[in-house]
Amino acid sequence: MPSASTRRRSRALLALTALVAALLAGPGAAQAQTQTPPATPKADCGPGSRPETGLQGRVSPEDHASGRAAQGFTCNTEMVGQYRVPNTIGTVGGFKVERYVDAAGHDCAYYDTTLLYPTNLLDQEGGVNVMDMTDPENPRLTARLVTGAMNTPHESVVVSQKRGLVAAVAGNPGTQAGIIDIYDISKDCRQPELRSSTPMGFLGHESGISPDGNTFYSASPAGQTLVAVDISNPTLPIPISFFRIDSHGLSISNDGRRAYVAGTGSGLRILDTTQVQERAPNAQMSEVSRLTWPTMSIPQNAIPVTIGGRRYVMEIDEFGTLSKVGAARMIDISDEKKPKVVGDMRLEVHQPQNFDAIRNDNGAQNGLQGYAGHYCNVPSRVDPGIVACSFILSGLRVFDVRDPTRPREIAYFNAPVDPRILPAAGIVPSPSNWAMSSPSFVPERGEIWYSDGLSGFYAVRVTNGRWPFRDSGGAGDCLRSATLGFKLHRIEGTRVVRVEATVNGKRRLRQTGRDIRRVTLRNMKRAGRLTVRIVATHNTGSKVVSTRTWNGCKKGKPRVRRIPRPR
């Protein structure tokens, strides 16, 4: 049994977390009722599935009473392997699952066990677990990282694929002194080597890392701080820039010059990080734009992606159960100064009209649990195809985003619910699931890895051909967006005054204007071959003819030809 002091610490931490969530929560259900987008279309569950029995995402009291919840719910998924802790007292999963393959070919997973630190210690779990995934059917624990930050990383565990580093900053549901731990995993990912543990993050809670692996960003929404730390020498981290912002999760653009920040109370914020990336003296970050949306609860995470040549940010909000569920969305940033929401990923349990029906479900009234979102991730930043999200009580959900304006659910996995030793102890919620982690992917095997706070780590395979999508030359499942935008090729010192566009030889657009810079073609066929020819006539009479081709979702190189003004 846990000691009295441990129980007191756990209850105090839970109270702190609840207070933070309450302070950041948005308006109530009345406003959400009139502004909530519709639920995403349900997945069509194929052979071998154990589908949900009612509302999309729901685990009802009847499901628990009948033993159905104990079997778990699957739709076009199957469990490949697991590292579970049965009959848990505290939490044994957490917020991040990361994957890395080292130079020797070892395949590893890293996940924190600290959803409600220090309750994980009650189950003899500690810090960040290192798993050998060479045989995904039998995940093998090879190490535990328990240094200052890794022992209580909150939402900050990140991996640099380029440099082979795993890093974190110490955090908790509020904020904590920003100790940054950096480990080298490039040689043998199964046995990380500590390179440094230093108090260079100022305050901790969340984090980001530049794709080149040279800059770690320590984020504290409660402390309103974002600190860029140079880790080019992982043994000697150096803070190089400070920005005042309510930064929750963030991602850095591939060139390192933009940060996409989920602000807990301020929505999506796009920051210019060029000076940080270039290591300018006294480097500064500045805001490019920000965006809020009517259903916003607590923005959690933002990731830039390119789909069909167009730029988007995938964003998810956390919490808001039975009130204002933020869930997830696709945001068009083709004009980064004017971002706009173009598609949503929501379940039926997130809809206000269903709140009365689900109110008494296990965990539904817990402000730190409930039917809501927490983390999403993508398998690739370029044409990712899917977004996978942890939706807490509803488990792991997988969405097709090849058309980001019309996401649709294609699969889900909600783990079997275990009994709990101390369901009424007030330390952790009653028997139910608590899927909060950012997942990772093995696209070549169709696997998604995630953790559940109350049972542990799972490797899940998507089945029935739902993902990876078959690329059959454009005639099958590899689909492009139905809306295509084009930035016009311009001759220096001139203006485009007339545009004509043909699609597969048929005219689709004719537009005139004083200075046309972009054109958009809508309601395009998403499959098959596509040839778009755009003729841009300039005010001097010269023309630029550009031809662009697609084969399914695969885009060919544009061909551009200039036609001089007739004499």
Task: Locate each region found by the language model.
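Short, surface-exposed linear segments at secondary-structure transitions and domain or protein termini
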Residues: 1, 150-154, 352-355, 420-421, ...
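Intrinsically disordered, low-complexity segments enriched in Ser/Pro/Gly/Ala and basic residues
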Residues: 2-4, 9, 541, 545
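Short amphipathic alpha-helical segments with coiled-coil-like heptad repeat character
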Residues: 4, 85-87, 509-510, 516
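Secretory targeting and sorting signals
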Residues: 5-32
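N-terminal start and proteolytic maturation junction detector
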Residues: 21-23, 49-52, 536
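Polybasic, low-complexity, intrinsically disordered segments
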Residues: 30-35, 464-567
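Feature marking well-ordered beta-strand scaffolds used for ligand recognition
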Residues: 32-468
